[in-house]
Amino acid sequence: VLVGTSNSASRDDEAKNYNFEGFLKEYLSVDILNYALPGADQDGSLIQYLHSSDYDPKAPPKLIVWELPANFSLEAPLTYRQLIPAINGGCAHSPEVLASASRDLPELKTAQRIELLSNTGRQRQDLQDLNRAFLEIKISDSKVKDFYIITYYDNGSRDKVWYRREGVVDGGLYYLELSQAPEHRGANLMSVFMEPVKALETPTTVEVQLCR
């Protein structure tokens, strides 16, 4: 499987600058499933592949070639907090669903927050120090690609993550591994909020699960 940027993407001959896919096919003597996308940023095409029906976590590819320009950084924690749950197959392949909720979102203004998941009151669970736990978020309107997910803990700390998916990459499904930052250790997860960067002009439905 080949993922990457416009340098590796399948294009018409007139627009093609390189033939990396053809080079791999010729010298490896294998067929190549090319998911590289122009304008998908550094991990967009890999996310596109992992979320597709071509990827099976029970029968993963023997090799993924991930082409990246030298100026792209692989140090951003959010990259791996999204990729690891996707590689493992999400909640469908998770042994335990800790919490779940579905919310019908009304029209929302920019920076207006809405709670997706609550862990308070009589139904409060012990959701502290969850190793490899992650959120699976499904948004019915696949055009919603620019928003924050904010996780609050009972010690006052919070984890605010910005999702900004490029237009060429499909929306609708998002993963977020819970933060392992020191400030959240020993704290119980209280709630998960969504905050759109751009106004939501039409109602949409969001389903969220906490799995591990």
Feature map (PLM): residue ranges:
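Extracellular glycan-modifying ectodomains
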Residues: 1-212
